[in-house]
């Protein structure tokens, strides 16, 4: 990925596209969560992201760094469950790490995501291999540092979500199931992969 200047229109496109992609898969995400969690991941994510869409004009009127922080606050306040604080932390950390010149490349995105992963580890008291969204974000972060293409990163995110299926959950509600959590995709891994795939597709179309 070369240099990318984040404009208000591009930010709006990314936020809207990502929100709509997850909302469209809300029932699937809830079905995944019914197997190993509270059964509300899709419902909660849909509620939070519908609030983001409803406030999109105000959000995208802000500089990108502040816009991401606003998205994060909305996710914390509106999503509920475990996902709200986690996705809120992700968005707010990305906003905190955002470059002052609004110019992005793979290396900078990799640094921003690395900081977000560390923040998520602290917030969720989880690490890699615990069958969470971290198991998608970490390989994506490595792919960014390696300057992989958007198509490659999208495929890596999809594969990483699928790789949570044989894992045993050791964090969150799914961990109560022990070995019975094996054989199911983690809902948070699925939703984060879906977001990354959507962002990659939109950025590829813009390049």
Description of each model-found segment:
Residues 1-207:
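N-terminal loops that bind phosphate or other acidic moieties
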């Amino acid at each position: 990925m070369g240099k990318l200047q984040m404009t208000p229109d591009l930010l709006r496109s990314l936020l809207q596209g990502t929100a709509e992609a997850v909302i469209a898969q809300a029932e699937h995400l809830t079905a995944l969560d019914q197997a190993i969690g509270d059964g509300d991941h899709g419902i909660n994510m849909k509620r939070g992201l519908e609030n983001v869409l409803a406030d999109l004009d105000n959000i995208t009127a802000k500089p990108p760094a502040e816009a991401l922080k606003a998205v994060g606050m909305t996710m914390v306040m509106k999503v509920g469950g475990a996902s709200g604080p986690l996705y809120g932390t992700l968005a707010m950390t990305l906003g905190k790490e955002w470059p002052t010149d609004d110019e992005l490349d793979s290396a900078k995105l990799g640094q921003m995501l690395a900081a977000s992963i560390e923040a998520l580890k602290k917030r969720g008291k989880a690490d890699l291999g615990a069958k969470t969204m971290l198991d998608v974000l970490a390989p994506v972060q490595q792919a960014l540092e390696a300057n992989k293409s958007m198509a490659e990163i999208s495929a890596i995110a999809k594969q990483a979500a699928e790789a949570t299926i044989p894992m045993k959950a050791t964090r969150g509600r799914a961990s109560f199931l022990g070995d019975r959590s094996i054989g199911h995709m983690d809902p948070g891994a699925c939703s984060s992969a879906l977001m990354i795939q959507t962002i990659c597709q939109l950025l590829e179309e813009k390049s």
